[in-house]
Structures are given as structure tokens and as C-alpha cells.
């Protein structure tokens, strides 16, 4: 397993990441290999435009059914919005991973 050095987000999340309002991302099993303490270059999914560096704080497994208002707050969304976004991106996936991070620059 190689440690990931990049991460992409839909461009609609850029402002929340840069303002510190979004402090986690929820990913599927294909993106569970981020390593706490490492720094990743972040770019937009749509066009690959780099916009910041994030330090990975933790990676924790979670089931879709365990998502709570706490997770939604860290994503700067309501719980209903969060569940809808997750279902759109990862339809039918139950096992997910919470990647917590902090903005480096």
C-alpha cells in the first residue's frame, strides 16, 4: 500500500475547506489509506486545480447508518444533506471512512 499524497473534492466544497468550516470528508474503501500525520495536495475533482494542502489527522471506519449530526456539522451540512450527498457519490455503500484533516495552507 502506498500512502496517498493527493485528495480531490468537488469544487463546491472549496470555500468551506479554505474557511475551516469543513474539517472531515467521508470516503469509501478505495480512499481509506490516508495516513495520519501526512500532508496531501488538494485539488478540484472537476478540473484538477490545486487549491490547498491538508494534514490528515485520522481515518476512522463508519457505517452509513451511524452518520450523525456531529458528522454533518463537520461537513458544514445538515444530516439530511450529508446523507443525500453520500448516497449520490457512493450509492448503496454502507461501509465508509471518516477522514479528519486540518488546513495547512
Residue ranges: model-predicted function:
Residues 2-105:
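Structured alpha/beta reader/binder surfaces that contact nucleic acids or chromatin modification marks
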Amino acid at each position: 500500500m502506498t500512502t496517498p499524497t493527493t485528495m480531490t473534492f468537488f469544487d463546491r466544497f472549496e470555500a468551506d475547506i479554505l474557511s475551516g468550516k469543513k474539517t472531515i470528508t467521508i470516503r469509501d474503501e478505495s480512499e481509506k489509506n490516508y495516513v495520519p500525520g501526512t500532508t496531501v495536495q488538494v485539488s478540484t475533482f472537476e478540473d484538477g486545480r490545486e487549491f490547498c494542502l491538508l494534514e490528515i489527522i485520522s481515518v476512522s471506519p463508519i457505517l452509513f447508518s451511524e452518520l450523525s449530526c456531529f458528522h454533518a456539522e463537520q461537513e458544514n451540512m445538515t444530516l439530511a444533506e450529508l446523507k443525500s450527498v453520500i448516497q449520490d457519490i457512493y450509492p448503496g455503500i454502507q461501509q465508509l471512512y471518516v477522514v479528519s484533516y486540518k488546513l495547512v495552507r
